[in-house]
Amino acid sequence: MEEVTTCSFNSPLFRQEDDRGITYRIPALLYIPPTHTFLAFAEKRSTRRDEDALHLVLRRGLRIGQLVQWGPLKPLMEATLPGHRTMNPCPVWEQKSGCVFLFFICVRGHVTERQQIVSGRNAARLCFIYSQDAGCSWSEVRDLTEEVIGSELKHWATFAVGPGHGIQLQSGRLVIPAYTYYIPSWFFCFQLPCKTRPHSLMIYSDDLGVTWHHGRLIRPMVTVECEVAEVTGRAGHPVLYCSARTPNRCRAEALSTDHGEGFQRLALSRQLCEPPHGCQGSVVSFRPLEIPHRCQDSSSKDAPTIQQSSPGSSLRLEEEAGTPSESWLLYSHPTSRKQRVDLGIYLNQTPLEAACWSRPWILHCGPCGYSDLAALEEEGLFGCLFECGTKQECEQIAFRLFTHREILSHLQGDCTSPGRNPSQFKSN
């Protein structure tokens, strides 16, 4: 059945069929400019549990002005391996060829993430399929596990990509965010892993998706699911910004000057809270159509403390710091420190400075979870695909289209004003 999303209204795309049965989780969103097409991905599960994931599903949306007309739900059976469940959709669009790569993991049977971490025995495979017609048809699955991870797999208790979107950098590099539970050592007498900790990293390709590699782990902080966005300061240097989930009640942020091979300035952002155990969040960069006054409070007491830095890249980052950015960041995430509720949209007008996030504009009041953003820069539009409900966050995955002006009108340029109440920004 076709549905239409109008600007500024939430439109459910995937609905839970029963509170103990078929459930859709883990949204990923991609926009393809030449065809004005949204691709909305999700996991179909037999229950809400991770180990009961089945396969990925897709709905294609055609944008007509500020309307999106959605086609029917399509199961992506191409994105499967025999005896495995498919999880964590992570799409990226390659502009030169027009090819869409859909990354995901395939996990053996019903083996849980916890079982893999405790035993140190990985049950996940790194895979992708691709489409050359904006998601109408898809290739056969390709397993990249040996090519990308190879002998290092013995140190990866388990791993995953995304979830959410990947990006293509100005250099042409394709970047897929990922994380692994890394095993630094083993108790040989018991054949059990020792001090296993999760760290984010990037998987990338410099030849339009023909071959793939992985970058260095983001250390020393524990980081899990992440997304990245490329920002450009006035000095003209592109910098890759990473936003990662942590269990530390605050979001982790890091910067890369080598296109994602390594990250520096890993820090906790006190302005971006995490609920207990954390939650996935989404980030996109964009060039603003209009520029109000910029954030002034870069010396806030909430400015993050630098945990790690690289001398070789410090000079470039220092050159960019303190200058207005050509790129802004938009970030989506639950806004409560206590539970996954009230999905917020945050704006950062100076991404290379500390503590310059706005107060959130509440896009959905009530239970919420994972989300994914897409920026339509030339049109001044944004899309958000997010988990939400009235009693539980897994009741549906909804889509919202909103404008650049709408963001500014709700946030009113606020960055750090302590007297502002997030309830002022709630949207019906």
Swiss-Prot record:
Active site residues per record: D50 (proton acceptor), Y370 (nucleophile), E387
Effect of E51D: Decreases enzyme activity
PTM-bearing positions, type Phosphoserine: S313
Membrane protein topology class: Peripheral membrane protein
Effect the entry attributes to changing R340A: Loss of enzyme activity
BP terms from Gene Ontology: carbohydrate metabolic process; ganglioside catabolic process; glycosphingolipid catabolic process; negative regulation of clathrin-dependent endocytosis; oligosaccharide catabolic process; positive regulation of epidermal growth factor receptor signaling pathway
Biased composition (Polar residues): 301-313
Temperature-dependence annotation: Optimum temperature is 20 degrees Celsius.
Post-translational modification: Palmitoylated; may regulate intracellular trafficking and anchorage to plasma membrane and endomembranes.
GO CC field: caveola; cytoplasm; early endosome membrane; lysosomal membrane; lysosome; membrane; plasma membrane; recycling endosome membrane
Enzyme Commission number(s) of this protein: 3.2.1.18
Region listing for Disordered, in residue ranges: 294-318
Motif interval(s): FRIP motif: 24-27
Annotated compartments: Cell membrane; Membrane, Caveola; Early endosome membrane; Recycling endosome membrane
Molecular function per GO: alpha-sialidase activity; exo-alpha-sialidase activity
Catalytic activity annotation: Hydrolysis of alpha-(2->3)-, alpha-(2->6)-, alpha-(2->8)- glycosidic linkages of terminal sialic acid residues in oligosaccharides, glycoproteins, glycolipids, colominic acid and synthetic substrates; a ganglioside GD1a + H2O = a ganglioside GM1 + N-acetylneuraminate; a ganglioside GD1a (d18:1(4E)) + H2O = a ganglioside GM1 (d18:1(4E)) + N-acetylneuraminate; a ganglioside GD1b + H2O = a ganglioside GM1 + N-acetylneuraminate
Effect of D50 to S/A: Nearly abolishes enzyme activity
Functional pH dependence: Optimum pH is 4.5-6.5.
BNR repeats: 129-140, 203-214, 254-265
Tissue/organ expression: Highly expressed in skeletal muscle, testis, adrenal gland and thymus, followed by pancreas, liver, heart and thymus. Weakly expressed in kidney, placenta, brain and lung.
Superkingdom in the source lineage: Eukaryota
Family: Belongs to the glycosyl hydrolase 33 family.
SUBUNIT field: Interacts with CAV1; this interaction enhances NEU3 sialidase activity within caveola. Interacts with EGFR; this interaction mediates desialylation of EGFR and enhances downstream signaling.
Record protein name field: Sialidase-3
Source organism: Homo sapiens (Human)
Organism classification: Eukaryota, Metazoa, Chordata, Craniata, Vertebrata
